[in-house]
Each structure stands twice: as C-alpha cells, then as structure tokens.
C-alpha cells in the first residue's frame, strides 16, 4: 500500500479535508491516507515547514507528502514536486521545504506542468491530488513536471552563525500544543559550531545555562521531587533535533507555558552564545 500524508491549514470544521481524501481515493483507491496536521496556522509556511520536517521520517521510504498551506499558484508561486531522502513532497514553491533542503540536497525537483491537462475549474489541491496519486502508483516525476534545480528559501527559517562563531541567532518558528517554543536552531548546528565549548541560551532578558537531555532531568537531591520543578523553564533538543524552550509540565490553565510565562512569540529571536 502506498502512503499519502496530508498537512494543511484547512482545519476540521469544514468539508475540505474530507473532500480532499475523497478525491485521492477516487483516483487511487489503494492509497493509505494519513493526516499529519490540519491545524497549521493560516498561511504559516514556517510552521508547516517545521511540522513536515519533524514528521516525515516516521513514514516509510516512498511516502508522498502533500502540503496544502499557502498553495495558490500565481505569478510568484509555482507548484513543485520534490524527491528528497527517498520521500516525495508535493506543494507550492513558497519556501515551505526550506528546513528539509538545508539538511540534504534533493534528489530531483520538478515544476508541475499538468494544469492544462485537468478539467476547467480544477483547484490547486486537485493538481496536488493528481500528482500525488501519480507518484504513489510509481509514476515518474518527469511525466508531471519539468526538472528544475532551485526552489525558494525562506530566510527566517535559516539560523545565522556569527562570523566569529561566537553565537548563533535563531527564531521561534513553531509553538506546540503545550506552549513549548521550537526554534530553527538544530542540535547538529550547535554541536558543529560549539566544537566542545559550553554555551548559554538567551532570549529577551532571560538566560538558560544548559540543555537537558529530557524534560524530567532535574536534580532531585534533598527533599525535592519532580513536582517541585513544575513551571521551571528549560531548554531541550526535541525529538526532531531542534532547540526548544519549554516549561516543565506546562499547562496553560495551571503552571503556564513558555509562551505565556516567558513571553515568547512566533518569530522572536533566540540566541546560542558560546563561552
């Protein structure tokens, strides 16, 4: 069974997600359809880029990932299909694949050119469905598009290493269900830049002196228990390999979250400063 994943900003109130799945099944009944998320903030390509980069590796090679966020084809934005790390991604060329392509060079990218082959009134997602089902059946990328070598990158998804390697400047690119704030700074980038040096994590007027291996890594000496640390700020490299600012056992209605207690917002600056 071929797998097609869906990541959109459609939400679940309306008919859009159900209709999208119906179109996929109509074209390829054998497809296995998996929802990654339909609650991406509207038109937020940074958030979508992080979500897909964090999720894709959980799926088998050959999976087709459809990304329906800010996907309208216009004078500035084309539709593309990319083969990358033996996975396939179908989306708009709006920078949404920036996090992936800074890690590994794509195997092949095509600009989709089948629009004139579809019925009049076909939507952007109709194009994506046709391309995704074609790929899922084993179809070649060259059949549905013209090969290209470059795609758009979004600068806010790229952390900046200082010229003297004394610091890394990043930004909050995603705030999760727990209110934890994920940055665009990866563990690999920190280790490669640190070369054995210790570092502080700074944002606003606050500093975190170390990165924990897991959320519950606290000193339990004396009479302290894990519950005593509820509400404490911490930094961790999350399971996707990105630096995350969090509150231990965060809860918006009780102890608060990194977003509410630390004042962090989408796009806020977070620095790694080497000692």
Task: Name every feature range the model reports, one short phrase each.
Residues 1-76:
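N-terminal glycine-/serine-/threonine-rich phosphate-binding loop
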Residues 2-5, 31-34, 63-66, 79-81, ...:
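Structural motif
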Residues 3, 262-275:
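Short, basic/aromatic-enriched C-terminal tail that caps enzymatic domains
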Residues 8-10, 36, 68-71, 85, ...:
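Fold-independent oxyanion-binding glycine-rich loops
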Residues 27-30, 45-47, 60-62, 67-69, ...:
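Active-site histidine-anchored catalytic micro-motif
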Residues 119-195:
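Anionic-ligand-binding alpha/beta catalytic cores of soluble enzymes and soluble regulatory domains
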Residues 184-264:
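A conserved acidic, glycine/proline-rich C-terminal tail/linker
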């Amino acid at each position: 069974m071929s797998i097609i994943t869906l990541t959109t900003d459609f939400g679940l109130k309306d008919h859009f997600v159900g209709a999208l799945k119906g179109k996929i099944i109509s074209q390829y009944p054998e497809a296995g359809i998996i929802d990654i998320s339909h609650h991406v903030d509207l038109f937020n390509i940074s958030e979508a880029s992080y979500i897909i980069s964090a999720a894709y590796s959980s799926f088998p090679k050959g999976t087709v990932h459809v990304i329906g966020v800010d996907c309208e084809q216009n004078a500035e934005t084309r539709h593309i299909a990319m083969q990358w790390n033996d996975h396939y991604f179908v989306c708009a060329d709006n920078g949404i694949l920036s996090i992936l392509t800074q890690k590994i060079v794509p195997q092949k990218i095509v600009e989709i050119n089948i629009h004139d082959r579809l019925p009049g009134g076909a939507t952007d997602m109709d194009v994506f469905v046709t391309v995704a089902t074609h790929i899922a059946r084993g179809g070649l990328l060259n059949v549905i598009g013209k090969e290209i070598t470059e795609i758009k990158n979004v600068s806010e998804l790229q952390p900046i290493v200082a010229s003297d390697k004394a610091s890394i400047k990043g930004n909050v690119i995603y705030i999760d269900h727990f209110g934890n704030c994920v940055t665009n700074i990866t563990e690999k980038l920190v280790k490669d830049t640190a070369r054995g040096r210790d570092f502080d994590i700074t944002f606003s007027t606050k500093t975190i002196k170390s990165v924990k291996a897991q959320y519950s890594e606290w000193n339990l000496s004396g009479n302290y228990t894990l519950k005593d640390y509820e509400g404490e700020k911490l930094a961790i490299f999350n399971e996707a390999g990105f630096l995350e600012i969090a509150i231990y056992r965060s809860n918006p209605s009780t102890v608060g979250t990194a977003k509410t207690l630390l004042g962090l917002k989408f796009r806020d600056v977070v620095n790694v400063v080497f000692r």
